[in-house]
Amino acid sequence: MNAVEIQGLTKRYGAITAVDSLDLTVRQGELFALLGVNGAGKTTTIKMLSCLTRPDGGDARLLGRSIVSDAAGVKRCIGVSPQATAVAPNLTARENLALLCGVHGLSRQETAARTEELSRALGLEPILARRAGKLSGGWQRRLSIAMALIARPEILFLDEPTLGLDVLARAELWDVVRQLKGRITVILTTHYLEEAEALSDRVGIMKDGRLLALGTPEELKRQAGCDRFEDAFIAMVREAGR
């Protein structure tokens, strides 16, 4: 069964078409990267798939549930770590996790167990007692991902997960994302070429709201006739602009 099936998905903002008749399939258990420069339509696509904004055309089915006709069902099976981390700055990391556990209806005992489980998995133990607003960008992003995983989603969206992080924090977060590969379906957006190449099973390259190319990093290099993924990306984007 496919995790995500997108058909003709379209979003307009006035005269601007942010996503233009997107067709795409993501397999269950896959780590899929949407890659593109700023304004390519990546974040808008994630917002539609996570039912944060309604499409103007087309539809998508997540594990068989329509984002148009069954948004509530979609939301029950997904987790989202947005580009701007949605942590409560005045609460500690532990309190942020507990807050989300409460939102999802977990008991006090379940909350304690889930907090311990996620803290151990994502290495959050050193910062559990610290206020989220005082944490570095890397720690805030880890906390945001942990919060997105509380309800054990089958599909996880990571929108620009390493944006603004330094080299070390990015490498550490890559390790966190790699732990999720094969366990759940992960869809991440990024404009970092090396991130898409290092982490993803397949990559979709977007430009101006359209899907230019789709395949594994190796397949995309072969399609473009390039030895380096960066060169393949540049060649495909430039060709589309002609």
Question: Where is each model-derived feature located?
Answer:
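Conserved catalytic motifs of ABC-family nucleotide-binding domains
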Residues: R152
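Conserved ABC ATPase signature
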Residues: N90, R131-G138
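Catalytic Walker B motif of ABC-type/P-loop ATPase nucleotide-binding domains
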Residues: L156-E160
